[in-house]
């Protein structure tokens, strides 16, 4: 299941045009998949320094995603169980890739949601927090360039992703594998080697912070 799409050629946009676009997003709410995707496509090729209105690029890991959320779509980032665009049921994911001699590959895992052991154990896949939050994702990609400042980075593709049936069957099986260990009190035994697409991994200050 390829998550990185073909790169588009960066376009040159004058600063004054960018400023008008950024001003236009204030007070705007994106409530349909079509309007969300259209807005996402409009950022392609624009240097992120021209998008960042709040200085987020200097704040460290995750800053690029926050810039897109705050300065481009005009909403406050959150880590709640709802999708980023709840009316449309769309979750935003901004992800880097690397270009090497063997082609393009993802730079890092795509973190989907927090596993709440106290709530998820009695749910089905279709009623799970993962499915509620991530069944449709807006994936925005950029090339990670180690020798360039983040302000030079540009979003080069934006696509709406819904899982194909053949992949969805594997993802559902992976979810059931993870939850079976949770239900039987073996959550501490969870390993990324248990599954194919969907994995349980620690993310945070220590191993007690677990995400899917």
What are these model-predicted stretches?
Residues 2-86, 91-212:
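Nucleic-acid endonuclease domains
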